């Protein structure tokens, strides 16, 4: 069974082809700078790289070039050969509680909630429509980053703002990175020999974007990101949690203008705002001689630690703490700082295991730990492929 996963942005298409009998990627690539003269498409397969450079005017043409690369690499001759195509969708709003087979009504709902994700959902829609035109009768499935968090209770997702306004305008915590949190929690449960529906965990997706998730009995019951990915942890360029009155104050004294707020909070804050770098590797390198870099590191780790404590209190019993994402997987200094002084919670990270050069899925805790600590490399594309296959098979039973 072959499943193609597409992540269509406003000017790019990321893609990965999976052989589902082995849960194995057999080809991956990207079509980038769509709509410019400098468009480029790259595919990696069979330990080789295939590339085409030429102007690509739109997503339809981008998919045509992707097809050319598939044929050239002999991994796929036509999209109609596929058993399914899975599409990553950033925001499902309150309309979607599970992954869905795509039809006209699904596309219409995604278009309707695009104001909640104006930078992402329009590109997703363009990818879906063009892929459907190019793939014959192949079923398409949409997999939402927000769906995993739809199991949060209302007292966790509702904001303490005027209730009627929030209901009318769909203002609430939605959460993101759901596909990643679900994947790594499923893997950790499997490594512990536990059924996912009995598994409790605190999942930390730490990268340029970062979020925490409390998982109880295999379901998300709270997460740090909110209406947008801006809430919660300190990130590369995003502020995370802050007093909203800061923005009002800066507007009142003339430091900010209304049209500068989004850029200020999303692109000029976080690690970058504190020390001038959004890259945790650079921050760690500079810490010894740069007080601001040290401050950024300590603020980042402190914020994560606070969320661990909060989610421990909410969950009561925790089976595992999971690190994933670029920082979570590759920054032992950050993991160590976060886990230091958490022994009273049962989290004991072994220093040598944490700083080992070993990669891939691994356990970091020592013999005194009551809570397992894992590093699990995320694989959102594989999780989307698995979800796509599940939805298609369920439809076939009807």
Swiss-Prot record:
Its EC number is 2.7.2.1. The active site is at 145 (proton donor/acceptor). Mg(2+) binds at residues 7, 380. ATP binds at residues 14, 205-209, 279-281, 326-330. Pathway: Metabolic intermediate biosynthesis; acetyl-CoA biosynthesis; acetyl-CoA from acetate: step 1/2. It catalyses: acetate + ATP = acetyl phosphate + ADP. PANTHER family: ACETATE KINASE (PTHR21060), ACETATE KINASE-RELATED (PTHR21060:SF15). Catalyzes the formation of acetyl phosphate from acetate and ATP. Can also catalyze the reverse reaction. This is Acetate kinase.
């Amino acid at each position: 069974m072959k499943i193609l996963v597409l992540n269509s942005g406003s000017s790019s298409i990321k893609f990965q082809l999976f052989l589902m009998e082995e849960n194995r990627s057999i080809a991956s690539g990207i079509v980038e700078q769509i709509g410019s003269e400098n468009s480029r498409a790259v595919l990696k397969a069979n330990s080789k790289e295939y590339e085409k450079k030429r102007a690509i005017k739109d997503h339809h043409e981008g998919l045509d070039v992707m097809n050319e690369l598939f044929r050239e690499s002999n991994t796929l001759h036509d999209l109609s050969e596929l058993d399914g195509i899975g599409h990553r969708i950033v925001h499902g709003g309150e309309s979607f509680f599970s992954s869905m087979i795509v039809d006209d009504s699904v596309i219409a709902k995604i278009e309707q909630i695009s104001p909640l994700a104006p930078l992402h959902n329009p590109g997703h829609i363009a990818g879906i429509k063009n892929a459907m035109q190019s793939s014959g009768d192949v079923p398409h499935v949409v997999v939402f980053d927000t769906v995993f968090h739809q199991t949060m209770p209302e007292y966790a997702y509702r904001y303490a703002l005027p209730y009627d306004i929030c209901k009318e305008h769909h203002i609430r915590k939605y959460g993101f990175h759901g596909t990643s949190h679900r994947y790594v929690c499923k893997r950790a449960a499997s490594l512990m020999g536990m059924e996912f529906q009995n598994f409790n965990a605190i999942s930390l997706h730490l990268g340029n974007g970062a979020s925490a998730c409390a998982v109880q009995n295999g379901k998300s019951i709270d997460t740090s990101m909110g209406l947008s990915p801006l809430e919660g942890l300190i990130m590369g360029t995003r502020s995370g949690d802050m007093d909203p009155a800061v923005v009002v104050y800066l507007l009142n004294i003339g430091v900010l203008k209304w049209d500068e707020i989004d850029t200020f909070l999303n692109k000029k804050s976080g690690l970058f705002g504190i020390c001038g770098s959004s890259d945790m590797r650079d921050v760690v390198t500079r810490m010894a001689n740069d007080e601001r870099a040290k401050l950024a590191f300590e603020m980042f780790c402190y914020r994560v630690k606070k969320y661990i404590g909060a989610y421990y209190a909410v969950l009561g019993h925790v089976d595992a703490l999971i690190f994933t994402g670029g920082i979570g997987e590759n920054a032992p200094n950050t993991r160590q700082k976060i886990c230091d002084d958490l022994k009273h919670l049962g989290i004991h990270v072994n220093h040598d295991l944490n700083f080992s050069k070993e990669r891939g899925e691994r356990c970091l805790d020592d013999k005194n730990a009551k809570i397992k600590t894992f590093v699990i490399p995320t694989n959102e594309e594989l999780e989307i492929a698995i979800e796509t296959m599940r939805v298609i098979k369920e439809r076939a039973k009807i």
